């Protein structure tokens, strides 16, 4: 009977006897059904829980109806919260993370900023926190030493107290992720490091082809079929055009010291040679290329001499298609010679050493591949054509015998250089000290 009277004296579903909760329950009586019989124990439990809470918690609880709050209290009443594992900040566990985080002691500015921030935030609640921090920093820099002294003393006191509280404290700064990101960027940059060098070689190949376009055959391509590359920069073009005007002179201090790989047959070179090619000096090869007087044929000419330039249409001879057109009395339109291991001597005329005939190499087309026109008569005029068409003058700084290119040889050297007995040709970058003398056959006029 006493329990029933207590239940009647309290509003139904009320967790506490406060006026606010009573008024709330009275308002919500219409939509919240009264608790069934036997809920007096729930009401008492709600009173105990509600009395233990502070006012803010009660205000937050008013969002829910009284019956919901009673049910939650009933469920949570017998639960032992010490069994719940506390979450560790920062993810991965471990002995270090299990310890509670100890903050560093505040320095003088932090003491000032903390006290001033509280005061200013109370006075100017609309101030943004970042703007407040900027202003506090400016004010701190304007303070004199005497004005800073109380904050410095407080910071020192806090430091001493911190040392007493945590005698074995060591500051362990958190590792920033940005450092790892920068490290990975540098790794990727190291992986990409070798590629710009290869691109530079590629650009040089395209650029030297552009240099030869300034001759007779504007708009026609010289060189192997390569994929399109980035065009040369203006600086490189400006450096290439004055070289076209220098006909026979060698520029001693040329802007570019590395070898231009445009006309070197890269398939002939091994990977080790290509790897160390940048260290070579252009003028190192000059000892093998004497300028004056008759000279023995060079290994590069044995390669380059097999090419043939017919009229105004440049032809790149492919290695994969060997030619059998070696008859000395061939007539009709000229056919290009294909580069083989031993160039056929049949297409070259009976020339004295040192005075080659450039008839087949000049800009004009001739009826036969090499029609002998006397020792000096035809060669001088054709050499003038060569100079005018800038085949020889395009890159005078480089040794002509080293580059396999149509009509890219010095006029003082024989154009034909077959070797005896089909000897294996040494590579162009490592000439040996002794050569077999070339054999010249007589080509009779048909």
UniProtKB/Swiss-Prot annotation:
Q: What are the alphabetically sorted keywords of the record? A: DNA-binding, Nucleus, Transcription, Transcription regulation
Q: Which residues form a coiled coil?
A: none
The UniProt regions of compositional bias labelled Polar residues, in chain numbering, are: 430-446
Please tell me which stretches of this chain the record labels as motif 9aaTAD: 400-408
Q: Which organism is it from?
A: Homo sapiens (Human)
Q: Which GO terms describe its molecular function?
A: DNA binding; DNA-binding transcription factor activity, RNA polymerase II-specific; DNA-binding transcription factor binding; RNA polymerase II cis-regulatory region sequence-specific DNA binding; sequence-specific double-stranded DNA binding
Biological processes per GO annotation: adipose tissue development; astrocyte fate commitment; cell fate commitment; cell maturation; enteric nervous system development; fat cell differentiation; in utero embryonic development; male gonad development
Region (Disordered) residue spans: 1-58, 155-259, 318-378, 425-446
UniProt lists compositionally biased (Basic and acidic residues) regions at 155-171, 210-219, 242-253
Gene Ontology CC terms: chromatin; cytoplasm; nucleus; transcription regulator complex
Q: What is its main location?
A: nucleus
Subcellular location(s) per record: Nucleus
| Location of the region described as Transactivation domain (TAC) in the Swiss-Prot/TrEMBL record | 335-446
**Matches recorded under SUPFAM superfamilies:** HMG-box
Relate the protein's function as given in its record: Transcription factor that may play a role in central nervous system, limb and facial development. May be involved in male sex determination. Binds the consensus motif 5'-[AT][AT]CAA[AT]G-3'.
* Region span, Transactivation domain (TAM): 224-298
- The residues that make up the annotated DNA-binding region are 102-170
According to UniProt, the name of this protein is Transcription factor SOX-8
So which domain of life are we looking at? Eukaryota
What is recorded about the protein's domains? The transactivation domains TAM and TAC (for transactivation domain in the middle and at the C-terminus, respectively) are required to contact transcriptional coactivators and basal transcriptional machinery components and thereby induce gene transactivation. The 9aaTAD motif is a transactivation domain present in a large number of yeast and animal transcription factors.
Which parts of this chain are annotated as the region Dimerization (DIM)? 58-100
Q: Does the keyword DNA-binding apply?
A: yes
């Amino acid at each position: 009977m006493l329990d029933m009277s207590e239940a009647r004296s309290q509003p139904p579903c009320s967790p506490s006897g406060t006026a606010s909760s009573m008024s709330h329950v009275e308002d919500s009586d219409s939509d919240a059904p009264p608790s069934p019989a036997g809920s007096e124990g729930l009401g008492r439990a709600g009173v105990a829980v509600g009395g233990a809470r502070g006012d803010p918690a009660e205000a937050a609880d008013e969002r829910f109806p009284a019956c919901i709050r009673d049910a939650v209290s009933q469920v949570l009443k017998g639960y032992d919260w010490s069994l719940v594992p506390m979450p560790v900040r920062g993810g991965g566990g471990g002995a270090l993370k299990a310890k509670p985080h100890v903050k560093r002691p505040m320095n003088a500015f932090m003491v000032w900023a903390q006290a001033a921030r509280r005061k200013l935030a109370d006075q100017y609640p609309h101030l943004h926190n970042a703007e407040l921090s900027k202003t506090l920093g400016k004010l701190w820099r304007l303070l004199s030493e005497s004005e800073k002294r109380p904050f410095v003393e407080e910071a020192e006191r806090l430091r001493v107290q911190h040392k007493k509280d945590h005698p074995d404290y060591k500051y362990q700064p958190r590792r920033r992720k940005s450092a790892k990101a920068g490290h990975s960027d540098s790794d990727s940059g190291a992986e990409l490091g070798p590629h710009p060098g290869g691109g530079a070689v590629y650009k040089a190949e395209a650029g030297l082809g552009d240099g030869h376009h300034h001759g007779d055959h504007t708009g026609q391509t010289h060189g192997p079929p390569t994929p399109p590359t980035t065009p040369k920069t203006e600086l490189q073009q400006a450096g290439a055009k004055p070289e076209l005007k220098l006909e026979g002179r060698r520029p001693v201090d040329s802007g570019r010291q590395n070898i231009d790989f445009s006309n070197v047959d890269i398939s002939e070179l091994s990977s080790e040679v290509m790897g160390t090619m940048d260290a070579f000096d252009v003028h190192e090869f000059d000892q093998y290329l004497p300028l004056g007087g008759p000279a023995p044929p060079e290994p590069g000419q044995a390669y380059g001499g097999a090419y043939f330039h017919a009229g105004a249409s440049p032809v790149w001879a492919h290695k994969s298609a060997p030619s059998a057109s070696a008859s000395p009395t061939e007539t009709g339109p000229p056919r290009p010679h294909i580069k083989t291991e031993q160039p056929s001597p049949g297409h070259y005329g009976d020339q004295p050493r040192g005075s080659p005939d450039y008839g087949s190499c000049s800009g004009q087309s001739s009826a036969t591949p090499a029609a002998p026109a006397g020792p000096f008569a035809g060669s001088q005029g054709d050499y003038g054509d060569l100079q005018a068409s800038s085949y020889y003058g395009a890159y005078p700084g480089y040794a002509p015998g080293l580059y396999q290119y149509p009509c890219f040889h010095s006029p003082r050297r024989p154009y034909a250089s077959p070797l005896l007995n089909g000897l294996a040709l040494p590579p162009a970058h490592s000439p040996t000290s002794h050569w077999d003398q070339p054999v010249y056959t007589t080509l009779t006029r048909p």
